[in-house]
UniProtKB/Swiss-Prot annotation:
GO biological process: regulation of transcription by RNA polymerase II
Residue ranges, compositional bias (Acidic residues): 58-67
Chain spans, region Disordered: 26-83, 278-319
Superkingdom of the source species: Eukaryota
Protein name, UniProt field: Zinc finger protein 821
Function field: May be involved in transcriptional regulation.
Entry keyword set: Coiled coil, DNA-binding, Metal-binding, Nucleus, Repeat, Transcription, Transcription regulation, Zinc, Zinc-finger
Main localization (coarse): nucleus
One example GO MF annotation: zinc ion binding
Gene symbol of the encoding locus: ZNF821
Organism annotation: Homo sapiens (Human)
C2H2-type zinc-finger residues: 116-140, 150-172
Amino acid sequence: MSRRKQTNPNKVHWDQVFAGLEEQARQAMMKTDFPGDLGSQRQAIQQLRDQDSSSSDSEGDEEETTQDEVSSHTSEEDGGVVKVEKELENTEQPVGGNEVVEHEVTGNLNSDPLLELCQCPLCQLDCGSREQLIAHVYQHTAAVVSAKSYMCPVCGRALSSPGSLGRHLLIHSEDQRSNCAVCGARFTSHATFNSEKLPEVLNMESLPTVHNEGPSSAEGKDIAFSPPVYPAGILLVCNNCAAYRKLLEAQTPSVRKWALRRQNEPLEVRLQRLERERTAKKSRRDNETPEEREVRRMRDREAKRLQRMQETDEQRARRLQRDREAMRLKRANETPEKRQARLIREREAKRLKRRLEKMDMMLRAQFGQDPSAMAALAAEMNFFQLPVSGVELDSQLLGKMAFEEQNSSSLH
């Protein structure tokens, strides 16, 4: 049975997405509009100024202290107050018609309830549109990820894609719920994270091309639009969302061409492509270091676990049937030496499993997440050093089997 990780045809190439959204992300980061009543914000800042003026410090010292706090980022509250204060000072510059523009902005923000959906939940920045919101929020996410993995800010687990990070972050949320940032669908479990849509949200004027994209089965579900839940402060975006897919197709033509080419390719071309991908993957794995190999295996196991959590009963039955057929074909063609080595490995795996079952639950979970601990436990049980190559492993297993047979015969 092949344990190779299969390629995902629905995977989004985030490098191409970020390249297409780079300009809009830059514009979103440069915007300075803050939702809410500017008058109330000015009153709050005036109260803070009155409190500070009662102290014995001078205004010059206060400005220097504020600048030091902003540069060092040691106080989030003072930094936010100074940021809003600077924005209000910019609005108070002697420019003609500035008060009229301020009233227009306040009126528009109060009159449009859907405009809050374009507000960043992390820095409260008004992005103006859904495209800019997506590009801006993933700038926050990119700050906590490495080149090959997306790190969870709560537990530090490395995940292979933003979609996997979003599904993983549902574990840390209190109510196990979240909303898609584009279509507004509420996800109540891991199985429905990429399936539920809200037709009312998809019919908004800001997304006119996505009319009636939502499934009719979602009408009987809970479609009450509530504020989104952002586990660990990360905004979640549904990878299979119809509205999000429309945005990606409109901004990255290469993604659309890639999907159409994969969908319409003949069987022979598909087999040749898969063979090329297997060859390239094998060459990459031959040149990787032991640390990279361990990280890749952990990432593959996590991705396979998440994939199996989302599969339906029919998909699971088909997968098990394929695995049984592949195992039957592989065992029919194996040599007696390979069969003997396989039986020994299965016996040792059962012994290791039984020993893990006798452990405490927390200790068992710790062993399951630590490959070095598993290797040490296996080495203690098998009486030889790990890791070793496949040929050495088979020879040592055969030698150990012969030694056990001699001991059993001498005892009898």
